[in-house]
Design a protein with these regions (language model features):
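Short amphipathic alpha-helix that is part of the acyltransferase structural core
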Residues: 1-35
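Active-site rim helix/loop that mediates acceptor-substrate recognition in acyltransferases
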Residues: 29-49
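Short glycine-aromatic motifs
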Residues: 12, 49, 117-120
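Acyl-donor binding region in acyl/amide transferases
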Residues: 69-118
Length: 120
């Protein structure tokens, strides 16, 4: 059994960042039937999902607690690939801070080809 862990105190002004990120994440959501835009927004509001925003990109993550370890899951991303790649060290530090031992991510074949050299 796995569960998402609420770790964010969500004190930053997420709504302003969400206005920018929403169209990028909406595009990514076209490839899943597990979530819709309202689900993602609610997850951010409740601190279950974490919103990462760059100048041209956005990413949504969540921390999942499995029986034997914690992992950070890269749920959705959109925008500039190089900028998203540059976010990974910060996400790794964040994950380590919360005791995560793994980083997971999935996606379309195009993303998977790009992420494979990074160890995904």
């Amino acid at each position: 059994m796995q569960k998402a862990i609420k770790k964010s105190n969500n004190k930053f002004k997420w709504k302003e960042k969400w206005i920018f990120a929403k169209p990028l994440i909406k595009e990514a959501l076209k490839h899943t039937d597990c979530y819709n835009l309202e689900d993602v927004e609610e997850g951010i509001r409740n601190g279950i999902f974490h919103l990462w925003v760059g100048e041209k990109s956005a990413m949504i993550t969540e921390i999942i607690e499995y029986p034997r370890l914690k992992a950070i899951n890269l749920l959705f991303c959109g925008g500039d690939y190089k900028e998203l790649q540059s976010m990974l060290p910060s996400i790794e530090q964040f994950a380590k801070h919360f005791g995560c031992k793994r980083i997971y991510g999935g996606g379309r074949k195009g993303w998977l080809r790009k992420l494979k050299p990074l160890g995904f």
